[in-house]
Amino acid sequence: MEKKYTLEDFAAIIKQLRGENGCPWDKVQTHESLREAMLEEAYETVEAIDKKDIQNLKEELGDVLLQVVFHADIEEEKGNFDLSDIIDGISKKMIYRHPHIFGTEKADTPKEVLENWEALKKREKKQSTQTEAMKSVADALPALLKAKKVQKKAKEVGFDFETVWQALEKVHEELLELEQSLCQTKQQQEEELGDLLFAVVNVSRFLKLNPEFSLTKAIKKFINRFECVEQSALMGGKSLSDMTLEELEEFWQNAKHSKNPTEE
């Protein structure tokens, strides 16, 4: 029977790769050099989930695990912590933040569990104010996702719109201010554009939609329609760069109103 490797085996493989007689590339990697790879593997895992590609999900989760073990080995070499410390830490965190399972607290609904989780998280991180909780949201997060998390922190203390219509009204207000900034400085335009995006995220939160996913779908839809435009042009013996804006717009409208299964 073919050997089935364990987590301990995998950690030993990484250790050998980074050892004295190991791989020249693996030996010189740092947290900073692996930063982009960590992000890429996380996004590729999410893509596998979105596509419901279970076989690829298994592979991508392995790639994420590679990053975890790699970073752990870097710190073990420095004498700071190792993989067992990471596992010990996350195990203790899960027990601490689930007192309704491992303790005597009561939480019967997912909402109550999340409320307890956030309260315990603030206590654990010694966050005495809601502002500190907001500032703790990672800067490395995609901006739309970070905006949503910050808005949820504000909601926890009651600082929020009452209805989605109020949130939409804010979008209209910010759009008007952006229009007015067009004759002002780039700095003012940037500020107003940021305010508009922040307001749009608020609407997505009320609709219980992920703004990142919504934008990703919009990008995919744009590419699909652009492909239809280009194919129509090629079938007519034309090049996009040689067409007028009016011609392109006509093709675009045709693509927009045609049934495209890839946009469903």
Where are these regions (language model features)?
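Flexible "arm" and connector segments at domain edges
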Residues: 1-60, 66-193, 197-264
